[in-house]
């Protein structure tokens, strides 16, 4: 039966309205937490991701470094955790071992964006637990020895020190109180940055995070204490973080500094002297090398209501790895990305040293109780450097605490 023309048009109009008023696909909001003070990296990448598509919007919250773990644990326990979090790599095992992080092993294996074979083994291992992958390294870094070539020449020192004893002797020669110049600066603060700096010395001294009182580790702490006792370093090293302590070097008020590649951008512009970077000195000539392995891992909380969308965000961040160094002075955790020349000869030479140092870098842990282990370590060197305990007694006490944790 044919509909009358008016009835047909009315039916067509109603059908068109129905089609036009079908509900649109809702935009998914993914919440993300990361630390503040990361050269604006996450802020920029989140902005770019949000601008690149309209299906997912990332809401980013920046949390102070010292507060991130405790706030994240509380949030997960109360059902208020974000979808994505960026955690310092030694803290990752605390969350993944407790079932707080989503197992992304299969998602990564099926991803057309992420290829785990191109990641450095150390950073990738820090995002793993019990044979499964719970996160992805954002970047990686390590520490080496910065030195002021002008002050070295003035003191008659031809090269950067290669052993601990040479470092101590050079610091004595370079120390110049009359001109407000210390021999060396670094971070020995009571916190993760201090452990980050001290653990490589323990490892070069034959120890590990689970064995911190070897004779070599004791010698390392004796040297740290001597540097402070002889006023070859400012007392501020006990409280300053790496960024601020290296600022002393940049200002020309310390002849050496132990710090990382995140300093290179401002050093190229702020330092008004000739400088270089050398591998960390070893306990003895030709002795075993080590260095810290830093930076953050991205993971998805197991409680996330939007795991697929959250994984798309992580894939996007992984796809932007070639931007990490040129824009943010971060070294990618991937071996397939060549660092571009910066145009600054000193910076380019320093990057080669840092890349070599990375081959010796070791993770902190991984262990679910890393924060307790780290506290035992920084409590020990703080106690020794402030004269409360001898270096040996302090490290023996730390070892007793750590043994009770790791068994």
What does each model-identified segment do?
Residues 89-142, 168, 194-197, 276-278, ...:
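Hinge/lid segment of periplasmic solute-binding proteins
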Residues 92-100, 122-159, 187-209, 229, ...:
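Periplasmic solute-binding protein
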Residues 93, 99, 109, 260-274, ...:
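C-terminal lobe and pocket-closing loops
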Residues 105-119, 183, 188, 202-222, ...:
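Short, solvent-exposed loop/beta-turn-alpha elements that line the ligand-binding surface or hinge
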Residues 153, 229, 356-407:
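Conserved C-terminal helix/tail region of periplasmic/extracytoplasmic solute-binding proteins
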């Amino acid at each position: 039966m044919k509909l009358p023309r008016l009835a047909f048009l009315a039916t067509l109009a109603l059908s068109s309205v129905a089609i036009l008023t079908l509900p649109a696909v809702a935009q998914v909001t993914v919440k993300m937490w990361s630390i503040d003070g990361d050269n604006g990296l996450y802020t920029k990448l989140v902005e770019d991701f949000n601008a690149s598509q309209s299906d997912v919007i990332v809401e980013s919250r920046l949390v102070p470094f010292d507060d991130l773990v405790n706030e994240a644990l509380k949030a997960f326990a109360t059902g208020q955790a974000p979808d994505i979090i960026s955690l310092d790599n030694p803290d990752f095992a605390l969350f993944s071992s407790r079932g707080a992080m989503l197992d992304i092993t299969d998602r990564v294996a099926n991803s057309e964006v992420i290829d785990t074979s191109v990641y450095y083994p150390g950073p990738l291992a820090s995002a793993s637990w019990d044979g499964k992958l719970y996160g992805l390294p954002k970047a990686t870094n390590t520490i080496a020895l910065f030195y002021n070539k002008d002050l070295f020449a003035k003191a008659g020192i031809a090269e950067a020190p290669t052993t601990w004893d040479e470092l101590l002797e050079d610091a004595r020669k370079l120390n110049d109180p009359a001109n407000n110049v210390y021999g060396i600066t670094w971070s020995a603060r009571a916190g993760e940055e201090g452990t980050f700096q001290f653990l490589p010395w323990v490892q070069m001294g034959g120890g590990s995070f689970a064995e911190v009182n070897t004779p070599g580790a004791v010698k390392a702490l004796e040297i740290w204490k001597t540097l402070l006792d002889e006023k070859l370093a400012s007392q501020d090293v006990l409280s300053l973080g790496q960024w601020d302590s290296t600022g002393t070097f940049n200002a020309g008020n310390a002849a050496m500094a132990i710090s990382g590649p995140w300093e290179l951008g401002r050093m190229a512009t702020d330092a008004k002297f000739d400088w270089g970077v050398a591998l960390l000195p070893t306990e003895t000539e030709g002795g075993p090398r080590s260095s810290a392995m830093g930076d953050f891992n991205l993971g998805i909380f197991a409680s996330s209501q939007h795991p697929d969308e959250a994984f798309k965000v992580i894939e996007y961040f992984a796809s932007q790895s070639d931007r990490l160094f040129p824009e943010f002075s971060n070294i990618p955790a991937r071996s397939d990305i060549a660092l571009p020349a910066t145009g600054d000869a000193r910076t380019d030479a320093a990057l080669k040293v840092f890349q070599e140092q990375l081959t010796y870098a070791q993770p902190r842990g991984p262990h679910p109780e890393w924060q307790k282990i780290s506290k035992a370590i920084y409590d020990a060197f703080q106690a020794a450097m402030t004269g409360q305990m001898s270096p040996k007694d302090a490290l023996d006490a730390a070892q007793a605490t750590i043994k009770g944790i790791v068994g």
